[in-house]
From Swiss-Prot:
The keyword Coiled coil applies. Residues 484-498 have a biased composition (Polar residues). Zn(2+) 3 binds at C175, H178, C198, H204. Zn(2+) 1 binds at C119, C122, C142, C145. This is E3 ubiquitin-protein ligase Midline-1. A zinc finger (RING-type) spans 10-60.
Amino acid sequence: METLESELTCPICLELFEDPLLLPCAHSLCFNCAHRILVSHCATNEPVESINAFQCPTCRHVITLSQRGLDGLKRNVTLQNIIDRFQKASVSGPNSPSETRRERAFDANTMSSAEKVLCQFCDQDPAQDAVKTCVTCEVSYCDECLKATHPNKKPFTGHRLIEPIPDSHIRGLMCLEHEDEKVNMYCVTDDQLICALCKLVGRHRDHQVAALSERYDKLKQNLESNLTNLIKRNTELETLLAKLIQTCQHVEVNASRQEAKLTEECDLLIEIIQQRRQIIGTKIKEGKVIRLRKLAQQIANCKQCLERSASLISQAEHSLKENDHARFLQTAKNITERVSMATASSQVLIPEINLNDTFDTFALDFSREKKLLECLDYLTAPNPPAIREELCTASYDTITVHWTSEDEFSVVSYELQYTIFTGQANVVNVACDGTCLLGSAGLCNSADSWMIVPNIKQNHYTVHGLQSGTKYIFTVKAINQAGSRSSEPGKLKTNSQPFRLDPKSAHRKLKVSHDNLTVERDESSSKKSHAPERFAGQGSYGVAGNVFIDSGRHYWEVVTSGSTWYAIGLAYRSAPKHEWIGKNAASWALCRCHNHWAVRHDGKETPIAPAPHLRRVGVLLDYDNGSIAFYDALSSVHLHTFHAALAQPVCPTFTVWNKCLTIVTGLPIPDHLDCTEQRP
């Protein structure tokens, strides 16, 4: 029915055709709508009859009128009959086409309103309040007027009654440019409600327009979407507001707790000060009592001495008045002895008296405590500690890290973190990261590669089980209740694996000495027992180290001590003991035979040209990467590098035909070799 209704709807008024005219272009138009089009083309005070043409609103075909005007056009009787039958077939009531159109127009306005609605049919003054609004009549009625105008008979039984709404809601919006026309379409170009005349003859005729229902659905969907987002945002804001309010409450509670804690701590300090005041005051009082008691005794002694002296002085003066020599001599000797004794006793008494006792032993100096009290403040995270690389020590598998802290008294514990150094990039990354230690991609894969030693109480720690000849990054975190801060990273490295020469492997014509660090040619050496590991054979004057290396990076040096015929290298355990090193696939060697220098492996020699007076050879073994490199240890000049997929543990091996060689092992890898291995 709705599809048929749309075919029977006038393109101007959007209602069912009323007295339709059949245009020459085969389209139809309501007579009144056609008349309004002519009126819109008239100038001021110009009669409608003067207009003799207009455009079809559907196809834009120009319709030329005769002298009779619109009356000269034929009536579309067939269309009118179809409309009449359609109206009869449609039950008049809420489901009728006209009512359906009105309902769609009123749906947005049927919400309850606080505006008071008066009866529009009342003769009373003032009018009574309306109880119903008839959508069909577009009028609001009071109870009496409703009964009078809408008896329970046809056709009034088909009228739709709703709760009273204002008249403006019933009649809908009117066009701003054509006051007698309702808006019935939407100009998309100007984003404005318009009427049919605006589209036909107004400034919107070339604009894109849309049906109100279409625009209504689109804008409603958009509004619903925006409303959903707004509601969601409001929900988030309400959640945030609740959290903020909760945070405010927590701030109040925590601040009150901290204030109470501050009062408690200050009361404890005051109590401690009062206790110390009482203790020190008691000591001062006790010292005063002791000193006064001693002084009182000294006063009594002085008085007693004075009394005896006064009596003695009186007797002496009386004796001096005696003129009889015999009597004077009889008493003078005794008095003289007593005077001498009294003088001596007073001399002994005087040094005991201290007239300048100022209680120096009870001197008070609270300057340090005053400074501490002046610095009283809430606890903060300790300052970052500093790693003292100059104090750190290392062996081939341990590193002892030392650090200092400015806030040593506020630090509860330290946390040591370390990992293998893989490049400068992960140092920068660690330094920029406050507490989380993660290396750059491809350098330090994850936080799992960092080892953590927690709860350290001292300012030093020894890490065991490290790889030899390897550089590590260390950082120290100082921790207390307020937080933690990490030190700048420090780079420390373990030494190479130390080893010595194995005398059991030395050729019979070689002597190992100097704590198994030197090997020399010795034709007069004593007989040595045969052993499977001993070098033998004509000219195979070799000796092996006492270690087999199967991982890591290691560096050692060989002092040639004036020898001009020797070989320095490495060999598998399976390498033949009767061949020169480098003559087989199981050994690699740098060789010198007087003025001829070469490197040798699997019987193949490659000449090299080192400095004429090479006195110290450096050997760098990187087992995991399969490289054996030789250097001039004094000038750091690279001589040669073997690249091999090492499949077995290798042993340092040495051959000497004249003079001696001395090894220096357990060295850290030099810095210029530690970053990148030199290539030939």
